[in-house]
């Protein structure tokens, strides 16, 4: 049986309400296509409010307090815990990762065989996007492969206003790409997602698009400011799409505790499963058995 490749795209700080729905103003034809052809989880709740605990949970399906250890003033992934990526490696997958240098501390070199870190100054529109495309097209990735891409481009919103305009994408200057800078950056990211997706064979590749956590920056109505952090920081988006595999054309679903989505992917793609995890598996949702997860 031919094993399916996995393109695992994580957009750091991508809020759910800015990914899907009539209130978003960004222009995202490629993200929209993934949602239309895949399974979109409308209310995915993150496991933490920072990158390292969230990513650690994604890789292990454990809560951050279970899979992280303290190293001085910082936390890192417990090296004694096997990650889902390790199980993919053990089942013949060639694992690759592109991530910002700050993620080194998680232990990415121990998790993935091939790592490609980039500096904080590098974004999709000034070299990183082309570098990712080169990785996909230079024939160094052996099938079946798993390619984890962690994009920090949304953090541009935290730059001072003038610096944001100076180093940001062309879309950030044009209102047609969104009502605020946050959504215009999303529009710019979507352009590069389209270029990346053009370089893979969707007939034999499962595409996962998700986030680690939300972010507070953006446009809010007065009512939004009254909501608890759960609404603007902990709700993120998650989409699992394989346009050529009808089993995943299931429309919108409700899901919580997002880290468990790697469990059914492991089981379906490589006959792998974990016997230790604190999240509910999404397999029944992906197979159409459950319409909602409570």
Label each residue range with its predicted role.
Residues 1-294:
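Catalytic domains that recognize anionic headgroups
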């Amino acid at each position: 049986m031919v094993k399916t490749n996995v393109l695992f795209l994580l957009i750091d700080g991508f809020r759910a309400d800015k990914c899907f729905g009539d209130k978003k103003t960004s222009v995202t034809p490629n993200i929209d296509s993934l949602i239309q052809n895949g399974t979109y989880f409308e209310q995915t709740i993150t496991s933490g409010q920072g990158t390292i605990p969230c990513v650690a949970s994604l890789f292990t399906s454990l809560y951050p307090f279970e899979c992280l250890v303290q190293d001085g003033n910082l936390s890192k992934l417990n090296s004694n815990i096997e990650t889902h990526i390790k199980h993919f490696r053990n089942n013949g997958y060639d694992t690759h990762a592109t991530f910002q240098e700050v993620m080194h501390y998680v232990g990415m070199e121990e998790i993935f065989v091939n790592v490609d870190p980039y500096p904080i100054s590098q974004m999709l529109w000034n070299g990183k996007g082309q570098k990712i495309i080169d990785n996909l097209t230079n024939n160094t990735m052996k099938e079946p492969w798993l390619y984890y891409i962690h994009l920090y481009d949304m953090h541009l919103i935290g730059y001072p206003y003038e610096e944001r305009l100076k180093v940001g994408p062309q879309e950030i200057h044009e209102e047609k790409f969104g009502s605020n800078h946050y959504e215009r950056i999303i529009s710019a990211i979507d352009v590069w997602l389209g270029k990346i997706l053009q370089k893979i064979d969707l007939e034999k590749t499962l595409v996962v698009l998700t986030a680690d956590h939300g972010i507070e920056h953006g446009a809010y109505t007065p009512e939004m400011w009254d909501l608890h952090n759960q609404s603007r920081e902990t709700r993120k988006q998650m989409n699992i799409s394989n346009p050529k595999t009808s089993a995943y054309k299931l429309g919108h679903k409700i899901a919580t505790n997002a880290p468990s989505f790697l469990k059914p992917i492991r089981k379906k793609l490589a006959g792998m499963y974990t016997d230790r995890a604190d999240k509910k598996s999404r397999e029944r949702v992906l197979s159409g058995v459950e319409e909602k997860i409570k």
